[in-house]
Amino acid sequence: MALTKPTAPVFEEMNTQPETLTSQPAPAQVPMVTKPALPSVGVFRSALADKQDVLKTEDVEALGFGTFPRMTADLGGLMLDKDELGKTARIEILSWNLRYVITPNSNDDEAKKHVKVSYDNQTISGTGESVQDYIAALKAAGYDKASSKLYVDIWANLVAYEKKGDLKPEEVKMVQVQLSPQSLQQFKRYQLEQGVRESQGMAVPRYITVTCTRQEFNGNRFGRMEFSIA
């Protein structure tokens, strides 16, 4: 059954005059509060992404171990092979490459003989053996903690360091900066933070400062590299 809308009742028109409405003043306008504009972020890209694998894996393998001086972090500071550089150094990054170390995770001399390297975490460099098969063989041999650990090698020009200052052009040398897993975390942090800065318009820096800091974890002390704009 359809419902019909009731019609409004008709009232007898009254002779009284309608009330006069008194206009009220418009409320005062409250000024709008605008927030300061934040710097716009463009397309984000990790800093130094274009430097990954500039030096090809086959070239890295052909160079072999120890071809260039190796910069590492020690409790006393940065080391270049056996030479002390001090707490800081300035470098120009040419390339950075992933390197996986397949290790028994044991400190005895015999275990050190079984350490292998892979650049893709699939095959052992120099032999072509499967990384997973090699780890399984190490565990079968009694090294229960055998595993693959990710490292990074940075190939760079060393242009200055704390103990000597700025190097003359003829003194600048190419070095292999070896990042431990702890230093690698700091490198990734730098890539993220600097990538944001560059997406906001900051110029890409040519040089980077490497600083060695002393760290402690689970009673173990070690040196760690940190990265900043030179």
Roles of regions detected by a PLM:
Residues 154-194:
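Short acidic, glycine/tyrosine-flanked loop/strand segments centered on an H-E-D-like triad
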Residues 187-209:
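Short nucleic-acid-contacting surface segments enriched for D/E, G, S/T with interspersed K/R
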Residues 184, 215-217:
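Short Gly/Pro-enriched loop/turn and capping motifs at secondary-structure junctions
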Residues 2-167, 217-229:
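OB-fold ssDNA-binding interfaces and closely related basic DNA-contact patches used
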